[in-house]
């Protein structure tokens, strides 16, 4: 099965998405938490063997440096370049945020002009609409990466060898649909709670994405960092 996850426009776009969930000024966000979420997302992509641009890995290495310096015991006064690295990162995120807002405003103005003159919309507008549509799926993916980060320790101590074909996406789709028939709604946490193997969790997640793609299952997240809820769609 060919799985394609809608990507962010770059590492700064991913960081901006994570920072914006806190709904505070960019310089007030808990930077270590944001870094951990970014690294969990990257690790999940690698585990699922999805393509990852080099710029994401470069940013990951820079973030790990900032995180390690933040967590080291403060035996000496903070080095000047330590503060500079963090402030430079936050400055880049803030600058990117302004750039993205301006781009969206320009796209909106272009859309309005296109309607007035009855001209076909350019590809940029359609591409932007697709990005907006996929945001809920990306939130699901980010939530999954956080759950996987929490379960890594358990998976590490389970050495049972599982063949790839032992877990089939089609079977997991049927399992999810059967549970939704009984329970009406299901959180992503509950869905993955009893997974003992990494392949099992990944296959369940991919099955969820396929059900969402086919519009058989809907998802809802009522608040930032809240539970992801899966519900059966009414046909």
Curated annotation (Swiss-Prot):
Gene name of the record: scpA
Keyword field contains Cytoplasm: yes
Lineage per the UniProt record: Bacteria, Bacillati, Bacillota, Bacilli, Lactobacillales
Subunit structure: Component of a cohesin-like complex composed of ScpA, ScpB and the Smc homodimer, in which ScpA and ScpB bind to the head domain of Smc. The presence of the three proteins is required for the association of the complex with DNA.
PANTHER family the record matches: SEGREGATION AND CONDENSATION PROTEIN A (PTHR33969:SF2)
GO cellular component: cytoplasm
Protein name in UniProt: Segregation and condensation protein A
UniProt entry tagged with the keyword Cell cycle: yes
InterPro entries found in the cross-reference section: ScpA, ScpA-like_C
Entry similarity comment: Belongs to the ScpA family.
